[in-house]
């Protein structure tokens, strides 16, 4: 039987990291894009491990040397998606998955588009980051019952509504055991860089505590999964 060929959208992007690489990138992406050796959040990493990880990211083309040669620069298309992880106002939904088999390539369709997950053959396991347009994410979260359908959720048109709705942001990161093709963990972003596009009616006094708690959850979850596999 001839295998069906699936054409993926040219706009779809995917990035595969080891746990150490992702931890390094997340630690380096707050409001800045430069990666150096004195990065907040990396105090527990040995300098040799940081250097080795940076070399790996350079080889993958995910970071570049700056012109002055003193630091490294995360490529713009990747930095834009990673920056949402370093912002204060992120809410995450954690889904622990066991024994869930995935094909070598999975096609996710949103409004006629395809987004892909492709485990990296060169890693025993790795992190896969999947992105989608904001309008697609809104639809998915509303379908999951995680965002209201009513008028309390409004897409803010700051410049051009069509452009704003198509702006891409981080949707999901997965930790994949690439040898067995099993998803060993997943973090789903309920709200990320949509902050500048979404407006909620009313105020929640507990909002800041919730954001801080959720951000600690993702940090603890990533550290637990990374340390368990001996990558940090």
Can you annotate each of these PLM segments?
Residues 46-50, 133:
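Short amphipathic alpha-helical segments
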Residues 2-23, 31-39, 64, 71-232:
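Non-catalytic recognition/regulatory regions in large multidomain proteins
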Residues 27-46, 54:
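Short acidic, hydrophobic short linear motifs in intrinsically disordered regions
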Residues 49-61:
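Basic amphipathic alpha-helical segments that dock to polyanions
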């Amino acid at each position: 039987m001839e295998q069906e060929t699936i054409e993926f959208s040219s706009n779809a992007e995917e990035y595969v990291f080891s746990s150490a690489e992702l931890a390094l990138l997340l630690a380096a992406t707050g409001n800045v894009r430069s990666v150096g050796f004195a990065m907040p959040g990396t105090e527990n990493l040995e300098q040799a491990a940081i250097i080795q990880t940076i070399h790996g990211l350079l080889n993958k083309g995910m970071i570049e040397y700056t012109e002055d040669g003193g630091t490294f620069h995360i490529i713009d298309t990747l930095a834009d998606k990673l920056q949402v992880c370093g912002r204060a106002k992120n809410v995450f939904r954690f889904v622990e998955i066991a024994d869930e088999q995935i094909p070598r390539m999975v096609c996710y369709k949103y409004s006629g588009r395809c987004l892909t997950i492709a485990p990296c053959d060169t890693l025993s396991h790795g992190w896969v980051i999947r992105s989608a347009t904001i309008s697609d994410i809104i639809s998915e979260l509303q379908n999951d019952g995680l965002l209201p359908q009513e008028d309390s959720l409004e897409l803010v048109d700051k410049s051009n509504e069509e452009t704003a709705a198509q702006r891409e942001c981080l949707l999901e990161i997965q930790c994949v055991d690439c040898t067995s093709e099993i998803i060993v963990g997943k973090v789903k972003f309920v709200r990320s860089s949509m902050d500048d596009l979404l407006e909620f009616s009313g105020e929640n006094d507990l909002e800041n505590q919730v954001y801080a708690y959720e951000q600690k959850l993702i940090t603890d979850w990533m550290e637990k999964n990374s340390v368990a596999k001996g990558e940090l």
